[in-house]
Amino acid sequence: VDTSKIISTSPVNLTVQNIYGGNNQGGNTKTTNINLTGGVYQNLFGGGNMAQTDNTNVTVNGITMTGKFYGGGNQADVNYSTNVDFISSSIEEDLFGGGNLGRVEGNTKVYISASTIKGSAYAGGNGTTAVVSGNTTLSIDKASLINKHVFGGGNAANTGEKDNTKSISTLNIAGATINGNVYGGANTAILYGKTIVNIGYNQTDYNQTDITIGGTVFGGGEANASGNPNYDYSFISVTEGITINIDANNYKNFNIYGSIFGSGNASSTKGYSYINISNYGTFNNYKENISIQRTDKVTIKNSSIHLSGTTDRTNEYSTTKFSISRVKELKLANDSTLFLDNGTNLLEKFTSLKITGSQEEVATVSINDKKVTRNVNNRVYMLENK
């Protein structure tokens, strides 16, 4: 089959159990196109049921789903790429850009807008055989609600290949309430490449609305299965590097209530890790976070953040709280302020700067005839004896 089309426009009382864009148990469909407006559906697969497809395209608007959504096939490969637009719709369980126990040999691209996901959203696939060989992109805007977590990778499904570590996972969050955590990587799987997490960062291509993240932002993946007590960070969830960009410019409400990790949760990266925070809080209206941890470089510009601190069971002092932990370099710039309830652990370098474009100028202060002159006003406040 060259091209398959499934179209539903404003159906009345339409209820469908399973939708497949491709064939059933055999054959190959080159391109699948699913366009649904309205209706109630249990499970949806952009690809086939145990039957390969080349490319899948799924656009839904105003639908209700009671099961799960897959951009790929069910136990069936997609030979090239998947493309998903999930708009003004709701789903009771999880949404995946990839397949269920089926590979995607190219890329996955998922756009969630003005929608409700009562489970988690994954850019990748579901299950150990649901590898995405190329890149993954997940973009969320327009006051979407994700009740659980957001992953730039899959669920127990790798992204990229061990012998070709060039995959890129990109998360773009322009407007959403996410009650759980944000992960640049996968859930209990490896991303062979690098992750880029953009939260409110130059999201001009999307509809900006308030951003609320109830949990923690991890540049990497979730290493531990539920109930696993092992948190030694020996698992490598991202092989080539992590970048987190947080920019609250032009947002009225923008809050992250957990910590910010340049690693995964109980997982690490072999490459460099960067956290860039801009326009996040003011001196009189600072942002509340728990900690900043496990990264090579943190750059904070024009921001004010209160860090309450937390423990790290892998530290020698495992019951001691730290506001900043295992950060190789901290750059505080452009009139930024940190309020630290607890101290720092293994912070190797700290600089106070004025940054203009790519130019960095070390903070200076002069006192002349009782007049104080600064080129920048960065501050760090710590509780006594901390």
Cite the ranges covered by each PLM segment.
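Outer-membrane translocation/initiation segment of Type V secreted surface proteins
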Residues: 368, 372-386
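Surface-exposed loop/turn motifs in large extracellular/passenger domains
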Residues: 1-18, 23-43, 49-68, 74-94, ...
